[in-house]
A protein has these predicted regions:
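Recognizes extended acidic, P/S/T-rich segments that occur
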Residues: 111-144
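Short, solvent-exposed loop/turn segments at the edges of extracellular beta-sandwich modules
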Residues: 65-69, 157-164
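Solvent-exposed, low-complexity, repeat-rich "mucin-like" stalks and linkers
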Residues: 4-38
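Pro/Thr/Ser/Gly-rich low-complexity, intrinsically disordered linker/stalk tracts
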Residues: 81-106, 163-177
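Beta-strand-rich modules
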Residues: 142-160
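Predominantly extracellular/luminal cell-surface or secreted proteins
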Residues: 34, 113-117, 154-156
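Surface-exposed, short loops/turns at beta-strand junctions within beta-sandwich domains
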Residues: 51-56, 140-148
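Serine/threonine-rich, repeat-prone extracellular segments and beta-strand-based repeat modules
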Residues: 38-70
Length: 177
């Protein structure tokens, strides 16, 4: 048995939300289906969600029913990593600071920013990417003694060379020894 479906420009799908923050639960945005300018009742189509629990891109498949049975549409939405909450910044050795965090199993890498400017602008701002999600700490050297540094971190999920970012953690201030 072989079915042929038209992916028709007149058959459009709009999602109520384009992006969710990972929370460990299945995500199902509300779907609105239109044919031309007419909004269809849900009795004229079925919705199937795929990969809609973990971080990454989820797929939404809409299949018409009844007189719309030959029509189908596909769209997607993102599930981004949650904000990093348990971070620690310490300076116990001169001109060094260590940033540590709780590993996010949904992430593939981390980005750390540190700066002498609390707005993370200017020449003292540095951005470092940690490419392995198994790493849980990083020590930075060559810093200026007796200066305050501001640090924030976020997790990243890489899917098909596209990056999904969590929001930045709360900024932590540390005085470097």
């Amino acid at each position: 048995v072989r079915a042929t479906y038209k992916i028709n420009k007149k058959f459009s799908v709009k999602l109520s939300v384009a992006q969710f923050v990972y929370n460990g639960k299945v995500q199902k945005p509300k779907v609105t289906v239109k044919v031309g300018s007419k909004t269809l009742s849900s009795r004229y189509y079925t919705v199937t969600y795929r990969n809609n629990k973990n971080t990454g891109y989820a797929t939404v498949l809409v299949q018409g029913k009844g007189s719309y049975a030959k029509y189908a549409a596909k769209t997607s939405f993102a599930i981004v990593p949650k904000q990093m909450k348990k971070t620690s910044v310490k300076s116990t050795v001169k001109k060094k600071m260590t940033v540590s965090w709780v590993r996010d199993p949904q992430a593939t890498q981390y980005i750390i920013q540190y700066s002498q400017n609390k707005n993370f602008t200017g020449k003292t701002t540095k951005t470092v990417t940690i490419s392995k999600n198994t790493i849980k700490a990083r020590t930075f050297t060559g810093l200026t003694s007796n200066k305050n540094y501001y640090v924030r971190i976020r997790s990243v999920k890489v899917v098909n060379d596209k990056k999904l970012y969590s929001s930045w953690s709360k900024t932590t201030r540390v005085k470097v020894k």
